[in-house]
Amino acid sequence: YTEAAGIEVAVAAPGADGRLDPEAIRETAGDRACCVAVQSPNFLGIVEDLPRLAAAAHEGGALAVEVVTEAASLGLLAGGGSFDFDVVCGEAQSFGIAPGFGGPHLGFFACDSKHLRQMPGRLAGESVDENGDRAFCLTLSTREQHIRRAKATSNICTNQGLMAVAATVWLEAMGGSGLRELSLSCFMRTEELKRRIMDIGSPWRIAHPESPTFNEFLLIGPGSGTELVKRLASESVLAGVPTTGWGGPWPDGLLVAVTECNSAADLDAFMAALEKLS
């Protein structure tokens, strides 16, 4: 998308703790960048220091953009809107949409009010109907959406509309407390597995033990992540994703994910297989 538009993408390297360094952002972005995009939790599952990164982006005159690839984290972690980010966008498949061979997906996009009229698409807002009851309507929609459709900034297909409805129903059923409980469950199970790995003194260790994580963490050790996956598979454990082949400045290791779908028996099986290989 960016290459055809003549937009240059510069990648800032993470620090020794697996997080983006604000100074690296300043050096990479300089005063030429239009925006600084930050994923949190990042590829390694590490939660970024959002306030410092937003400040670093704004110092050079760039917009600060947070990308959330695991929306379940928002039940526990404050989003970029709480830390002076201009745009927050991401993937909301976790909100009640079952994965099927990778899809379907549901993207979300939010921004500061000062950028509202530059947003693509239409905004649905809350209002009241003629009886005074709660209702929803299109509160902002560019005329091109309805008149000059060839010049519209976006169009939504039926499938995406269905995904939005499904996620809305799921969130309404879960409620704020339910979403927080789910997020906390993911966090606590991940922390339990990390603690158990450190307790057994395995040669496979947590890559960044001091950095906060959500859902995922990186295991590094005497061999490659690909080798560890194969060895654990021989013990009937589907362990995770090797970082090799994904590009980026990541150590060669195994990315392990823990969610509310992983039972205590699943964690026990993982630990038993890892201890056997150690």
Where in this protein do the model-derived segments appear?
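Glycine- and acidic
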Residues: A10, C34-Q39, A62, R149-A152, ...
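Residue-identity detector for threonine
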Residues: T2, T28, T69, T139-T142, ...
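Active-site C-terminal subdomain of aminotransferase-like
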Residues: F95-I200, I206-E210
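Electropositive phosphate-/nucleotide-binding environments in soluble metabolic enzymes
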Residues: G15, R19, E23, L44-V47, ...
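Conserved PLP-enzyme active-site core in the AAT-like
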Residues: Y1-A135, P222, T226-L232, T244-G245, ...
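Conserved C-terminal alpha-helix-loop-beta "cap" of PLP-dependent enzymes
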Residues: S177-M271
